[in-house]
Amino acid sequence: MDNDFEQDPEQSASPRKPRKGIYILPNLFTLAALFGGFYAIVMAMNGRFDMATIGVFCAMVLDSLDGRVARMTNTQSAFGEQMDSLADMVSFGAAPALIAYEWALKGLGRWGWIAAFVYCACAALRLARFNVNTAVVDKRYFQGLPSPAAAALVTGFIWIMTEAEVTGPSQAWPMFAIALYAGLTMVTNVPFYSGKDVHFKKSVPFAVVVLLALAIAVINIHPPAVLFGLFMVYGLSGYVLYAWRKFKGQPASMISTSTDEPDERGLHQ
């Protein structure tokens, strides 16, 4: 007999613990994302800020794929989770801070390295909080600005300025403000939509495919400006959502106090 007792429904709905072991495919994507961050740091040290920013954006694309690859191939593991966090710290924490400092913040003296450190420290705090709150946060939203989006704000500004041939020292204070905004927003409780409730395996109307094609075409018009604009909108959207929830009298926190309610089941996996 396979089972001597009937499994409790709440047990079956609880998330499975990540398996122990190391799987090649998802960790290859994670290592590639880590290389993107490392490459960005090297390029910044050599004054190639355009290539440094592209390295961070490439790391963002690869970082968005490793988790999906692991789920699709059923190769999630505790090792992969830890590896992903460490790679994110390099690519979206240390790399953007160093790029911003080398490009513009260096000219502000102590204020420059303080802004760079605040961003880097907030990225570390954001990633640590994400790891410990995974089971209690509504998966439809991020608690605070996600580190890849924060990195996109910092490096996207540098990318668009270098494309326009604007020198870093002339943009020191705007860079200071963006670094602080991105860093501090990472550690707030402001909700940002995660998109994790979108099911890619379900069929979609043909119009959605057309819109995706148009979006790709628009991005290719001028990638630095379009991408920076999109992430600026996203970086402000959390505060709009927070204000709207407050106005409607809804809880603004993404941490649930109960997982027993029917509308909350499955939202914390």
Predicted regions and their residues:
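Helix-coil boundary and interhelical linker segments in multi-pass alpha-helical membrane proteins
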Residues: 39-54, 94-114, 156-174, 220-225
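Juxtamembrane membrane-interface segments at transmembrane alpha-helix termini
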Residues: 64-72, 124-131, 188-189, 239-251
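Short, amphipathic, aromatic/basic-enriched membrane-interface segments that mark the entry/exit
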Residues: 19-27, 79-87, 140-143, 194-204
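C-terminal membrane-associated helical module and adjoining short loops/tails
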Residues: 1-14, 139-269
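"…together with the soluble PPM/PP2C metallo-phosphatase catalytic core" -> "…together
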Residues: 18-29, 36-49, 54, 104-134, ...
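Short hydrophobic alpha-helical membrane-embedded segments
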Residues: 27-34, 86-93, 149, 201-212
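Topogenic membrane-insertion module of multi-pass membrane proteins
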Residues: 1-64, 241, 251, 267-269
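Multi-pass membrane catalytic core of lipid/isoprenoid biosynthesis enzymes
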Residues: 22-30, 72-127, 156-159
